[in-house]
C-alpha cells in the first residue's frame, strides 16, 4: 500500500480490477442508499481501485470518472483498454521491430497476462502478443484519480 495503511481486503490500493458484467451500477458513495450516477455497459472494462471499504470499491475509469461499485461486480482478472482513437499494434515480441500479429481497434479491450520492461503480453482467443505498456489503459502503477475526489464524471 503506497501510504502503508492497511486496507479492508489487505490488497494494495491503487490496484487494477475489471468489471464482471455488462451492467454495473456506479454509485455516488459506498452503499445502496447512494444515488446511481450511471451504469457501465462493458464487461471486462479495466478500472483502478483508488479506495475501498469492506464491501465497496471506489474506482477510476478510462474517462477519469470516479464512482463506487460493489465488490461482487469486480473481478481480479486483468484486461487493458485502447483508450485512443488509433489502433494499437500487437507484436510477436517485445520490440517495435517484431512482426505485427494483430491490431487492437480504438476503444477495444483485450485480456492481459503480464507486463515487463515496458511491454504487456495480451491474448484474445488463440492469438497472443505484446503491446507497449504506454499504449493501453489498465497498467499504470500510480493512482490515476485522486481518492479524495467525490464521485462524478471525469475532469478532463
Language model region names:
Residues 32-37:
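Short boundary/loop segments of OB/S1/cold-shock single-stranded nucleic-acid-binding domains
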Residues 1-28, 39-43, 50-53, 60-65, ...:
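SH3-family beta-barrel domains
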